[in-house]
C-alpha cells in the first residue's frame, strides 16, 4: 500500500472556480483586496499606482486573476499559511542560503533564453478620447541581479533593434510603461 499525502495552503480554494467580476475606479491592489476579503485570509498587498476606470476578471479563477494583475505591476504573490502576500521582490536582504556545489547542492540545471529580451521596446495604444496614438518607449528595468550577462547583451543576440507592443485597449501612458 502507498499513501500519498498532498498538503496545500488554504489558498487552494482560490484556484478552482472560474469567475467573472467587474471592478470600477479601483487600483489593482484594491481589486485584489476585495477578492481576498471574500475568503478567510489575511493580506499584505503592496499598493499599486494606476487607478483603472474598469478592471474585468473574465472566466478565470481568483488566484489566476490575482497573479496576472500582480505580475502586470511587477509584484510577486505568494500564499503563506493563510496569508496572501503581494509585493516587490526585496533583493537587499541577507542571503538565506549559501549553495555550494557538491556540498549543499548536488545538481543544477539552468537555461538562458534571450527570445524575449530586446534592445528597445516601444508600446503603442489608441487614445479614444483624443483620437490619437500614444507611444511610449520602455525604460530600462534597472534589474542587475540576473547574473553576469547584461540585458543589453541578451538583447543583441537576436539583433532586433526595436520591438513594438500594440495594445488594443484604451490604456494610459503609465500602464504602457
Task: Please report, for each region that a protein language model flagged, where it lies by residue.
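Amphipathic alpha-helical and helix-coil boundary elements used as assembly
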Residues: 1-177
Amino acid at each position: 500500500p502507498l499513501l500519498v499525502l498532498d498538503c496545500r495552503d488554504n489558498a487552494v480554494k482560490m484556484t478552482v472556480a472560474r469567475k467573472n467580476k467587474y471592478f470600477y475606479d479601483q487600483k489593482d491592489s484594491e481589486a485584489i483586496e476585495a477578492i481576498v476579503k471574500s475568503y478567510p485570509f489575511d493580506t499584505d498587498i503592496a499598493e499599486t499606482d494606476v487607478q483603472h476606470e474598469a478592471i474585468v476578471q473574465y472566466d478565470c479563477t481568483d488566484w489566476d486573476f490575482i497573479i496576472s494583475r500582480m505580475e502586470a505591476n511587477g509584484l510577486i504573490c505568494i500564499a503563506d499559511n493563510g496569508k496572501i502576500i503581494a509585493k516587490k521582490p526585496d533583493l537587499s536582504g541577507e542571503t538565506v542560503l549559501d549553495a555550494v556545489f557538491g556540498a549543499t547542492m548536488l545538481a543544477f540545471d539552468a537555461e538562458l533564453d534571450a527570445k524575449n529580451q530586446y534592445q528597445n521596446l516601444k508600446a503603442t495604444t489608441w487614445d479614444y478620447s483624443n483620437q490619437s496614438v500614444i507611444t511610449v518607449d520602455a525604460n530600462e528595468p534597472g534589474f542587475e541581479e540576473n547574473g553576469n550577462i547584461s540585458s543589453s547583451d541578451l538583447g543583441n543576440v537576436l539583433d532586433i533593434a526595436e520591438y513594438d507592443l500594440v495594445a488594443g485597449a484604451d490604456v494610459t501612458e503609465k500602464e504602457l510603461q
